[in-house]
């Protein structure tokens, strides 16, 4: 089942032409969407520490700003993942790329890459950047999304959508990346496409815009 998903997802992503948002004033960043194959296809998220300069305390995929020395956005995503989680880039098969996705107010344009990891990795999280590592089965996110009217920041309104998983709220740019990712996974037949629901009750308000 897992290998079948890998093959089909690679086919779907190979046929996808990633859309580039035109934001010349933005700072480019890259993230890896890591899928661990066994015991079932599972996503790795990080909970960022409260001492980081941006997106502090939020749940995110591993990644960060693209440096001038990075040969490509994909290389930056793998480098940042290794720095944050100690994950050997050689253990990651990059299946493809999603559309670039901007953060609303922090000025980043995110290049997202989907990576396949065949065996459970021995992670070594960097305590300066990572407070906690979350391992979330893809099927736990399938077909569910919580949409909210939005929030205000410096006089502007921003739409908000989020997943709630085991009392963790995954929102902001990470939630938008999950939606993109699940659309592609749904095209393989492994899960259903993301839905829209407001039936979960209250969830904590985001502490900072993303």
Q: What do these predicted ranges mean?
A:
Residues 1-60, 65-121, 130, 151-153, ...:
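N-terminal leader/linker segments that precede catalytic domains of diphosphate-processing enzymes
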Residues 125-157:
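Amphipathic alpha-helical blocks and their helix-capping loop/short-beta junctions
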């Amino acid at each position: 089942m897992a290998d079948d998903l890998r093959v089909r997802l690679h086919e779907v992503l190979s046929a996808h032409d990633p859309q580039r948002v035109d934001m010349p004033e933005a700072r480019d960043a890259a993230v890896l969407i890591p899928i661990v194959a066994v015991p079932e296809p599972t996503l790795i998220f990080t909970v960022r520490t409260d001492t980081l300069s941006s997106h502090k305390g939020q749940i995110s995929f591993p990644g960060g700003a693209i440096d001038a020395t990075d040969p490509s956005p994909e290389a930056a995503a793998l480098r940042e993942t290794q720095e944050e989680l100690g994950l050997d880039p050689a253990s990651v098969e990059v299946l493809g790329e999603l559309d670039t996705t901007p953060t609303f107010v922090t000025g980043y344009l995110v290049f997202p890459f989907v990576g396949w990891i065949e065996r459970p990795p021995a992670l070594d999280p960097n305590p300066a950047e990572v407070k906690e590592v979350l391992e979330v089965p893809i099927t736990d996110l399938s077909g569910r999304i919580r949409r909210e009217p939005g929030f205000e920041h410096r006089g502007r309104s921003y739409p908000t959508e989020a997943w709630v998983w085991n009392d963790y709220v995954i929102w902001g740019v990470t939630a938008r990346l999950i939606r993109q990712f699940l659309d592609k996974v749904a095209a393989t037949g492994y899960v259903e496409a993301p839905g829209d629901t407001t039936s979960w009750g209250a969830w904590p308000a985001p502490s900072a815009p993303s």
